[in-house]
Amino acid sequence: MKKILLLLTLVTPIPALADSIDEILEKIASNNLELQLQQNIMETKQIENKAENVLGDLSVTYSSFYEQGEGSDHGSEFVATQGFDFPTQYLSRHKQAELENASFNMQYLTAKREILLKAQLLCLDIIYLNQEKELLDIRLKNADRLEELYKVRFDAGDANALDVNRVKMERMNVQTLVAVNNAAHRTAMQSLLTMNGNKPLEFSSKEYPQIAEIRDFNALKDEVIDSDPDLINLSYASQAAHEQVSINQQEWLPKLELGFRRNTDNNKAMNGFVVGGSIPLFSNRHQVKISKVEAINAQLEKKDAELHIENSLMSLYNEMLQLKETMQSYDSELMYSSLELLQKALDEGEISIIEYFIEAESIYNKLLTRMEIENQYRK
């Protein structure tokens, strides 16, 4: 479910997210080294993009000429010229650069979304591990109590060695599960720490954040498509491709050149100006046709991405509904109550230790399955 919700959080953050997870994501957004790199790359591309739509360099030439022999004349020529494109071309390139820069920004937001999604899923896994640890603590406490109880019963002759060994093996099994849980928890926290640039983080929540229930798939689909950074990026890229068509069409316009010229000889100096230009008869051949095809391809790519996102969203939505229905079929209160009744029945001698372990193991597994389903649902 979080995969669906995080598609919306970059544009419209969800207020219902728990503060603890919200704070974790905020810190990672500030401290993640990969995000900092992506931001620098984005800013560099934007600067480079703007730098391309400027006047060319000023051209300056100086030449000296003379005749050989006594009393010969000599002279010089100085020329400074500035070439430039037709003014409308600068406007079109500026518009295209703005679209491309917006596309670069969306690419950065896409990278940010993926990193924050990974961090958020880690937080949800840590919540699951904390819940599992809480259940294992209850189970270990019961195992410790049973070990003490059956030690007393064995000494009193009310229990045999086989019963005592069963209790000890149960405790060994629970201790192993606790160790596995602790290792998984440390790994998840270390991954979260790495994503935060190795700056300290604390996260010990055992409760999932409250989230608004999604009821209308069509409304969800429209909101995701309108706010998804991948689609927005493709939209900007499509607009930029169409703008490139206009730019290439204007490449047939002449290149202009204006300048100052000064000629001197023995007796006088003359000042003037230079006007020139070039007509691109061959350099722009087929470029308009190519750019039109690229614009069509960009539009098709956007439509294809919309279909993929819609299908993926439908799959996630159906999976979410199925997981929710399955999760609601488990009655956690009933299972915890059954554990207490089992313990009471064992203490009063109404059931054997074997019957207790068989029933208790079944209940613990059901509780754990319910936790796993909820964890998957929250994702």
Task: Show where each model-derived region lies.
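Periplasmic alpha-helical coiled-coil/stalk elements that build and connect Gram-negative outer-membrane
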Residues: 2-3, 114-227, 316-323, 363, ...
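Sec-dependent N-terminal signal peptides
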Residues: 4-13
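Bacterial Sec-pathway N-terminal export signals of envelope proteins
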Residues: 17-59, 84, 92, 98, ...
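Hydrophobic/aromatic residues within transmembrane alpha-helices of membrane transport systems
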Residues: 28, 80, 126, 192, ...
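Alpha-helical structural elements of signaling/regulatory helical domains
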Residues: 30, 86-89, 114, 135, ...
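Amphipathic alpha-helical coiled-coil segments
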Residues: 35-52, 111-138, 145-147, 152, ...
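Small/polar-residue-enriched beta-strand and adjacent coil segments characteristic
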Residues: 58-111, 232, 236-244, 249-306
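Short, charged, amphipathic alpha-helical segments
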Residues: 94, 98, 161-170, 292, ...
